[in-house]
From Swiss-Prot:
InterPro entries: Phageshock_PspC_N, PspC. This is Uncharacterized membrane protein YvlC. It is found in: Cell membrane. GO terms for cellular component: plasma membrane. The keyword Transmembrane helix applies.
Length: 65
């Protein structure tokens, strides 16, 4: 079973989106575009807060080994 973690290989900022993409076996670039569109539609703050919270809650790939 896959574990959710922040990706070390597929990251731009903290690896949150890359980790989600690896967990669900999705394309990380597409997920990043969807995240940006969602952020624009919700005035950025909610998505930014969720992203920051996930940085602290979801362990990094390095911690999972």
């Amino acid at each position: 079973m896959n574990k959710l973690y922040r990706s070390e290989k597929n990251k731009k900022i903290a690896g949150v989106i890359g980790g989600l993409a690896e967990y669900f076996n999705w394309d990380a670039s597409l997920l990043r575009v969807i995240t940006v569109i969602l952020a624009i539609m919700t005035s950025v703050l909610p998505v930014l807060l969720i992203y920051i919270i996930w940085i602290f809650i979801v362990p990094s790939e390095r911690d999972m080994k």
